Amino acid sequence: VPFVYGVQAYGLNAYVTGIGGTKRIVLWDTIIKKLTPGELLVVMGHEMGHYVLGHIWYSLIYGSLFLLLGLWLIHLTAGWVLRRFGGRFGFTELGDIASLPLLILMFSLFSFIMSPAALAYSRHHEHEADRFALEITHDNHDCAMAFVTLTENDLGYPRPGWLYKLWRSSHPPLGERIDFCNNYHPWTEGKPLKYGKYFQNDSGDPQQ
């Protein structure tokens, strides 16, 4: 990633964005001020994980499929809706501009129904980026403390109920992320790293 940008803001956030020559990691100035150097390295490792693992591309593909699925479901159901309620709506064809509010309503409904799958996919990417950060830094303590700081700063609830997680959480709950930071250390147990092929040791060989 050729560029790292700082952004003035009030919350704590960092993200990777861009494709090709526009790719960059963005760190809000608040996260630079509030986290220790070790914690910032973990955050950078997390964002590097998103980039190295191609999460932006996967998200673009998944988002496109999600859009197509929503449009396909509208195509399947719109005819029945018009036959059933068209007289009340004042139009009988989707080609009528007056049908636009109905299309928006139907797409919003299908998006809501499909959101648990989309959010689960997002949480998986975030979890794997956390794993990447731990494997590249080997720093369990700073990883956990970074999420503790995020929890305190955002006044977040670290362990929400399963229903909230299912329908609202694009990231794993902070409590789960802290637990993972504390408990994931295959390098101390002689186990292979899942993403060791992306790292090099002092001799230039991939880490195992």
Stretch-by-stretch model annotation:
Residues 1-94, 104-208:
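Polar-ligand-bearing catalytic/cofactor-coordination segments
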